Amino acid sequence: MPRKKPFSVKQKKKQLQDKRERKRGLQDGLRSSSNSRSGSRERREEQTDTSDGESVTHHIRRLNQQPSQGLGPRGYDPNRYRLHFERDSREEVERRKRAAREQVLQPVSAEVLELDIREVYQPGSVLDFPRRPPWSYEMSKEQLMSQEERSFQEYLGKIHGAYSSEKLSYFEHNLETWRQLWRVLEMSDIVLLITDIRHPVVNFPPALYEYVTGELGLALVLVLNKVDLAPPALVVAWKHYFHQHYPQLHVVLFTSFPRDPRTPQDPSSVLKKSRRRGRGWTRALGPEQLLRACEAITVGKVDLSSWREKIARDVAGATWGNGSGEEEEEEDGPAVLVEQQTDSAMEPTGPTRERYKDGVVTIGCVGFPNVGKSSLINGLVGRKVVSVSRTPGHTRYFQTYFLTPSVKLCDCPGLIFPSLLPRQLQVLAGIYPIAQIQEPYTAVGYLASRIPVQALLHLRHPEAEDPSAEHPWCAWDICEAWAEKRGYKTAKAARNDVYRAANSLLRLAVDGRLSLCFHPPGYSEQKGTWESHPETTELVVLQGRVGPAGDEEEEEEEELSSSCEEEGEEDRDADEEGEGDEDTPTSAPGSSLAGRNPYALLGEDEC
């Protein structure tokens, strides 16, 4: 029997590290030499990985990786629909870090906030989305999938050949997720494209509009979601912008949590939050508009009277709940039939699919990640039936929900279309998972040059001895000042954790508590006209009518504390699985950072 070889403590440590890396699904087991939490986060994703097709040599980051030892008991791969983005090179990340430390931030003019869709997507260029290639029933499943993979690689090759990596935005490189979109479009009678009102041009790919209304011959309804986060005049301006440029669109305004815009707002109280309980989902603004749009599209081919009756019941129930002071959400309403689509349901359908089959209209909900597709479905149903999360890519596969016996909703995973947007803007739009950003500082600088972050958060320059003196700010200074104010420290050296502070600032922006809204072209010159527009007044009255009136709890303030340590190095974006709770920005004069109860906010994401 051979002698046992000595096994040192160092070797044992390396063995355990490799084992943990394999469980996380990482390929090369890179470990950071830094002991700080921020350093380990930034270097943990440094492994090289390629997409499923070997013809595209660009490095791909596979986000939302789930630990898995292969297929599950039912043959389900939890990483099948994870986000695939092009990886930033190490040199590019370091260059942006240096710029964040050295570049002095200058406020931009209002005209810079105006976005033209022609500059973002360049209609008619290769910035398209992949189409399902022609197929026939004689083809086997393997032949069809192989053909789709070849077509997808050709699509990626054209884009990367026409534009450099520095010009291209993040966009989806996972073919499995695009297959979800193909299936949803094939089975839908009406397509809802959900966008965020703060930046609707970012979420509106013209190629999808041309494909749905042209090649498929379907009606496209543009939903401007989260209208409570933008001024009513800006909402109306965006609505007219899309009507003017895309006449076949049906535009609907929507929000799951409306507020009265006539309520005075304190822009400095970004850390104030209130909890809405009870019948929050039944207060959604927009179901009536969406019903009218669907009635105009179906022109009597589908009986939608049951949908109208449901809306009337929801409105009456919400009014009764406010009057009686009831706080608990009613759970004994009509059951909602949920269908999870299996692989067999993902098979392509024929080109001559019957429209409004069996008297049922199928409404497909598509859009970018984090625009509120799942929240919109919850608002239409009147209670929570879909899990929602701040983390992009939370919806893994499409599901169908029967709103009424004649109305079926289909929720599609969020997809990011190729464009020429700055990647910092995509991060602020919530498209990229914040906890997995390699370099968040330039996104903070992009935000601070467009809204006065230092003034809103009452930040003190880290090098300022006299608080009244003015000092030039860079993105790194803002992150360091926020880390000092919030008490974010690294684990061992107790230095200011600027990486964690940058993530916290980006979460405030994504949540709408640091609201950055973009404008349609010419809005600055015509702002007064839009503010006095009749539709603006109508929207203000409508939001005030359906806004919260008695279903809000006492406001909560966030604690200035360093006791809220993050658990490990994993994504801390928690799924919002509560049964009717929703954190929403609110305003209150005299907001402070120190809460009276030091344990009240131990579960907050920013801690």
From Swiss-Prot:
Biased composition (Basic and acidic residues): 15-26
Keywords: GTP-binding, Nucleotide-binding, Phosphoprotein
Keyword Phosphoprotein carried by entry: yes
Keyword field contains Phosphoprotein: yes
Ranges of residues in domain CP-type G: 178-418
Biased composition range(s): Acidic residues: 550-584
BP-aspect Gene Ontology terms: DNA damage response
UniProt binding sites for GTP: 225-228, 367-374, 411-415
InterPro entries the record matches: G_CP_dom, GNL1-like, GTP-bd, P-loop_NTPase
Family note: Belongs to the TRAFAC class YlqF/YawG GTPase family.
Functional note: Possible regulatory or functional link with the histocompatibility cluster.
Domain comment as written in the entry: In contrast to other GTP-binding proteins, this family is characterized by a circular permutation of the GTPase motifs described by a G4-G1-G3 pattern.
Protein name: Guanine nucleotide-binding protein-like 1
